[in-house]
A protein has these predicted regions:
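Conserved alpha/beta core of the MobA/IspD/sugar-nucleotide pyrophosphorylase nucleotidyltransferase superfamily
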Residues: 177-251
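Short, glycine-/small-residue-rich phosphate/pyrophosphate-handling segment
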Residues: 158-176
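A short, N-terminal amphipathic alpha-helix
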Residues: 37-55
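N-terminal nucleotide-binding beta1-loop-alpha1 segment
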Residues: 1-23
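Short beta-strand/loop segment that forms part of the nucleotide-sugar
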Residues: 57-65
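Short phosphate-binding loop-to-helix
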Residues: 71-108
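Conserved donor-nucleotide/metal-binding helix-loop-beta segment in metal-dependent transferases, i.e.
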Residues: 119-145
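Short aromatic-hydrophobic micro-motifs that form the base-stacking/packing surface
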Residues: 110-112
Length: 251
């Protein structure tokens, strides 16, 4: 029954060239950026499915734009559900996704970005465990850029999404402040990173293509096979990014 499940919703955009990962253009082309978006989405969804084999999770894609249902139906693992789009802006999308999933009767809700394909599966499992413990709380996964890659809730708290400077380095800090204002305890997960600019793309490439001993890597993450395969192809075909993407097995 849904009240016994944690609804884990990926905040997902369909891979339409020119509308996704535009901060990576250049060095990527708009088409390459769209292909990277698809690879990341696929890996994040498979990661959620992996976590669902270890914890009481129902996977969702809170998708945008309207009319892209077929794209997600073809991409998502079996058992995933679609959450129709409400708003194009990040803050309102998060707010409405959380509200709608609680209204559907789920016992807890976790919203996760689609930009962290190597997020360790155990962080998703840990989130459900934290949300199953007695007492109200919010679970936050801080991102290296000052935002968060995940927010988990036991109850809907609209205040967590208000007065936030979205898409800035202040998001995580402001969300902590909003939680304090309403007396809501915060459980903090390990830091991870989003892939949305050249620096983080380089970090992703080092993690997936350089091996576990590469200096400066986030180690122990999800293998992200679709994203790794895309990066290997990219390294062979786009001369503008070859210096960013090491060959597999080299530091």
């Amino acid at each position: 029954m849904s009240e016994q499940l944690c609804a884990v919703a990926i905040m997902a955009k369909a891979s339409i060239a020119g509308t996704v990962k535009t901060r990576l253009v250049p060095p990527l082309t708009h088409q390459e950026a769209a292909e990277l978006n698809t690879s990341c989405l696929s890996d994040v969804a498979e990661n959620v499915a992996t976590a669902a084999a270890q914890a009481p999770i129902q996977g969702f894609a809170a998708y945008h734009p309207a009319g892209s249902e077929r794209f997600f139906e073809d991409l998502l693992p079996s058992g995933f559900k679609l959450l129709p789009p409400k708003e194009p802006t990040l803050g309102l999308s998060l707010l409405h996704a959380a509200r709608d999933l609680f209204a559907a009767g789920y016992g807890s809700v976790c919203l996760v970005n689609a930009d962290s394909p190597t997020l360790p599966t155990e962080l998703l499992v840990e989130t459900t465990r934290r949300l199953d413990e007695p007492g109200d709380r919010v679970v936050l996964g801080p991102a290296a850029d000052g935002g968060y890659y995940l927010i988990g809730m036991k109850h809907f708290h609209q205040r967590l999404f208000e007065a936030i400077d979205w898409s800035t380095e202040r998001v995580y800090r402001q969300t902590i402040r909003r939680a304090g204002e309403i007396g809501l305890p915060v459980a903090v997960l390990a830091e991870w990173y989003d892939v949305d600019d050249e620096v983080s793309l380089t970090l992703l490439a080092r993690e997936l293509l350089s091996g576990p001993d590469a200096t400066g890597c986030y180690n122990g993450g999800y293998a992200a096979p679709k994203t790794a395969a895309f990066l290997e192809t990219l390294a062979a075909t786009n001369s503008a990014v070859q210096h960013l993407l090491p060959a597999r097995g080299k530091n």
